[in-house]
Amino acid sequence: MTWRATVLTLFPEMFPGPLGVSLAGRGLAAGLWALEARDIRDSATDRHRSVDDTPAGGGPGMVLRADVLAAAIDAADPVPGRPRLVMSPRGRPLTQARVAELAAGPGPLIVCGRFEGIDQRVIDARNLEEVSIGDYVLSGGEIAALALIDACVRLLPGVMGKLDSSAEESFSAGLLEYPQYTRPKSFEGRPIPEILTSGDHAKVAAWRQAEAEALTRARRPDLWAARSVARPAANAPAKGESQKTPKNKTDG
């Protein structure tokens, strides 16, 4: 069965957007995954195709109506079983682990909110999982949905050109990715670290692991703490070893 993402949106013309180019686009054209963007307004019942109304209790903006959105969900997903997501800044943070779960399934139905939000009753009645891609507010859920789909699609078989590529990137092993270098060998007086051109694969692997751990400790202490809980022995410093972040030879 082909992995399929179904998106409910007021702006279906935003899809596939950037998902139609590069690796994701080639995979889409080759049938490695599928995308369906459905207009929420198609489920409106009045002649104006209204989808929103003023907030109960007062306040600024408009709220997506529960009846219209429920009808759109039921039409797109008549037999519940797929993950049903709604992109929301108040949702649980999207993680690489959750992305891997979604990529391993049939593909999600994703609701893209607009205005002040969505009537809570449809979130509860249709069991929508609220998902956030960060602590900031966007104009709507479409950009967040594109990011989520892209993260999933690149894990699908055949989409990535090199099988190891996704496994070695940030978050895949609970760590940020190590620094990358390529030609020229020297750039503005900054050389590629010698160990990367040594041809010693074991030393290269050890260097990359150390750099990934150092970056994670320095930039994402939350990830490092979670990894340390899961793998205390692996992350404990050796006797007499400091926790200082190692410097590249290019750091001065």
UniProtKB/Swiss-Prot annotation:
| Comp. bias (Basic and acidic residues) | 241-252
Q: Name one GO molecular function term.
A: tRNA (guanine(37)-N1)-methyltransferase activity
Localization in the cell: Cytoplasm
Question: What SUPFAM superfamilies does the record point to?
Answer: alpha/beta knot
Q: What is its main location?
A: cytoplasm
Broad enzyme group: transferase
> Which residues lie within the region annotated Disordered?
229-252
Look up the record and give one Gene Ontology term from the biological process aspect.
Answer: tRNA N1-guanine methylation
Q: What is its EC number?
A: 2.1.1.228
What are the UniProt keywords, alphabetically? Cytoplasm, Methyltransferase, S-adenosyl-L-methionine, Transferase, tRNA processing
Q: From start to end residue, where is composition biased (Low complexity)? A: 229-238
| Reactions that this protein is recorded to catalyse | guanosine(37) in tRNA + S-adenosyl-L-methionine = N(1)-methylguanosine(37) in tRNA + S-adenosyl-L-homocysteine + H(+)
Supply one GO CC term from the record: cytosol
Instruction: Tell me the domain of life.
Output: Bacteria
Q: Where does S-adenosyl-L-methionine bind?
A: G113, I133, G134, D135, Y136, V137, L138
Concerning its family, UniProt says: Belongs to the RNA methyltransferase TrmD family.
PANTHER family (alphabetical) = TRNA (GUANINE-N(1)-)-METHYLTRANSFERASE
Tell me the function of this protein: Specifically methylates guanosine-37 in various tRNAs.
Q: What is this protein called?
A: tRNA (guanine-N(1)-)-methyltransferase
Which species expresses this protein natively?
A: Rhodopseudomonas palustris (strain HaA2)
Gene for this protein?
A: trmD
